[in-house]
Amino acid sequence: MKTKITLVLLLAGNLTLFSQVLSYADQAVLFSSEDMLGTARYMGMSGAFGALGNDLTSIEINPAAVAVYNGSEFASSIAYRDSNIKSNFYGNTIDNQDDYFRFSQIGGVSAWDNFGNPDIFKFSVGFNYSVTKDYNNNYIVQGNSGVPEFLEDPFLNYDDDPDNDVFYNNVEDQTFINYTSGINDRFTFSFGTLYKERFYLGASMTFHHINFYQSTEYKEINNDGSGDFLDAYNNQTLSTYGNGFNFGIGTIILPTDNLRVGVSFQSPIWYNLSERFNEYLDIVLSNTNEVYVESYDPNFYDYQLRTPSKLNGSLAYVFGSAGLISFDYMYQNFRNTKLQPSSAFTVENQDLSSSLRNTSTFKVGTEWVFNIITLRGGYRLAQSPYKEAGDSFDLNGYSVGLGIRFSRNFGLDFAYDQSTFDDQYRFLDIPGVDAARLQVTNSRFVSTLLFSF
């Protein structure tokens, strides 16, 4: 039963409550977005790898990258994230800081020489597991909009008795707590070949998994102007989980020995998702001994999601064994995001089409080798998919990296990445009440253990 999608739940009498968990449209955007996660080499160059290859995470951007390998490689990565979310609601600002640690990537590649065909110089296969989105976040919003969500005594019948004129319309405090957890991860299988020494060709199949949990708490204290108080507490929980599939194709072309051009396409991800929605409400009045409580049976609902496809164009120049510079451009058609079955999501799909825009992401990275030490750096800019979002809602990020090659077979890579963007969360759907503003800064440190053989 798709109760949550209506955003309005009639609890009792005249009491109306709005959904505070993410809407289906907002979930669709969230599940279509990715973090900067992967190997430390990839992150150290801000992901500008579409024309380079020779990195396990780059295979997920351009499958032809697997064919660049000349041998076999195994890599595993762990990531630490420091999250700072600064919330502002009607002039009241709260700094919310948390840190998280997780295993983020593991994979391997094997390459073989040609099988007697003079045009096919080698064949490569690869496997990579990676976390694409970390949903762990926690923040508090507190302030006073001056407009109450809970105005009336739930035990009084305002429609049938006109003498019931007690309204708790003086807001003293409004607090919203949002807790999310879970991950979006994927398994990518890729294969590629080098054709006539100038054309790397590749294809991939990727299996995705989503496990998302959200718990929201809303607390409001109001008074009636005569010394009596209403204290309301509302808790909503949402669990969404499921699996998806997509495919990718790509090529890397070498017009000269130093110049590389990459083009790749990632199909939409087709998800089958299931959700569970719970809700609890209690209201305490200071002038009575009664407590109003509503607790609902869980709602379960299954649906499908189609995320945007991705088109990536890349250009890189390699200065022999000394270093390189690389540029990536990615285009995503967010307006084609769809929820299904279409008959059940007419309003949401119209909202996605009208409120979203197709986006561009720009990445630039560089790498320089000094004997066994490699230094890296990068910058990226990712547009917000929301049409009405200002420039501050775009994501800006930079990265630095260090690689140490202890031997031909063993190395360690490290990377630091920081990104910032603005966001908002509308936990009160009341005309004239603003959404909470959020300033989000994520700082990540990643290390990768590398074996070549």
Language-model-detected regions and their locations in the chain:
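Outer-membrane beta-barrel porins/channels
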Residues: 20-37, 111-453
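Short, glycine-/Ser/Thr-/acidic-enriched flexible segments
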Residues: 50, 81, 330-332
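Sec-dependent N-terminal signal peptides
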Residues: 4-13
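Short structured motifs
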Residues: 61-62, 433
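Sec/Tat signal peptide C-region and signal peptidase I cleavage site
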Residues: 15-19
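N-terminal targeting signals for Sec/Tat export/insertion, comprising classic cleavable signal peptides
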Residues: 30-51
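Outer-membrane beta-barrel translocator/receptor signature
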Residues: 40, 52-61, 67-139, 182-185
